[in-house]
Amino acid sequence: MLAAVLLGVVADSYAQKRDKLYSWEKRRDIKPEFTDMVLCYGGSAHRTPFRWDKERFAPMVAYTDEAGKEHWMFDSFLFLEFTLKGGADGAQYSYGTGYYGFSAGKKQWAELIDYWFAEGTGFDALEQAVREASGRMGKPKARRKVVLTVPDPILYRVYNDTMSTTAYWGELDGREMDFSKAGDRVAALEWYVDEVRKRYNAKHYKYIELVGFYPISEEIVTPDEGWNYELKHSDEFISPLAEYVHKYNYCLCWIPYNRAAGYRKAKSMGFDLVYMQPNHYWDEKGDKPMERFFTDIEEHDLAMEFEFEETLLTRNERSDVYRRRFYDYMEGAKKHGVYGRKQLSYYQGTNGFYELSKSSDPKDRKLYNDFCQFVINNPLRKRH
């Protein structure tokens, strides 16, 4: 009912074209069965390295323990990006509300899709990495799962300039989309989802599976919660997006920052998996206590995100502080009954896990092995 009210009369001719489920979508339940999802940022030229090739994925796919035995590592991967620097026209664009640059339009959304589906990177490279690991260990019980980011349909061409145009995104079926209309924002999101589905279907992957989508904003601002609702109107498109991806048997995932606007009501808006960020890794003031975090996620039935970056490597200043905080995540998850009961996601900066896996420093090796053992022995995985 809500989606129908929001959509109104919009892009009807386009909507009528898109009710077909692909065969692999028909066979699937929308309930996501994966336990440990690692975040992979990519698509913008400022990322170093830029490409996600099979060598970069390899440590995330398989882990060799200290006895020389190989194990499957992360069972799911979130491909995401929030900004575009060095794109086709050289300008800077934002995929999420609140970031610097022009709001990304249809061309930039297409660039993001192109990046993840390019030959030798993204989906293709992950498929290769899993195939090669399968040659050594045999096929895993299930395909590795992929969740792909969804850009914000940002209201204004410059997100905080209400004098800038709302008709900047591009056309659908020959009609210019105007993001002052909720239905046009939803139509753009549906176009994006359909383009991703079409591109994935054409690839015929055997070792990976596209299972969900992820709105890039870390807060869901509504009239009664959050800042600058007049610039965001998040509630106009989240529930319709959830309804749309569910129609094709995908899950909708979200990772809000600690106590972000919308975290209490996310499940009622249609999200299937909500991993809240503790933000403890960067907490210099002590105002994001882990005890409060665990109470929050239990009360609101949320999953947990782990957080680390390259800063925990021994070569970096204050690495001991960051290592200690990361151990707090593992110890806290076990202490509070999250480990083995709730799904987990892992923020690792741009390349943190890869660099940790390649380090020869004894402290780094210990952390790497402790963390990998934590992931591969997740009791929840054994039930899937």
Residue positions per predicted region:
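Bacterial N-terminal signal peptides
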Residues: 1-8
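Well-ordered, non-membrane alpha-helical segments in soluble/globular domains
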Residues: 50-63, 99-134, 171-200, 228-243, ...
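Aromatic-lined carbohydrate-recognition surfaces of secreted/lumenal glycan-active proteins
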Residues: 142-154, 175-193, 211-215, 241-263, ...
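Boundary at the C-terminal end of the N-terminal hydrophobic targeting segment
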Residues: 13-15
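Structural preference for beta-strand elements that scaffold enzyme active sites
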Residues: 31-40, 71-79, 141-147, 208-214, ...
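Extracellular glycoside hydrolase catalytic/binding regions
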Residues: 192, 216, 220-237, 242, ...
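Substrate-binding cleft of secreted/luminal carbohydrate-active enzymes
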Residues: 70, 74-75, 80, 257-262, ...
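N-terminal catalytic cores of secreted or lumenal carbohydrate-active enzymes
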Residues: 18-190
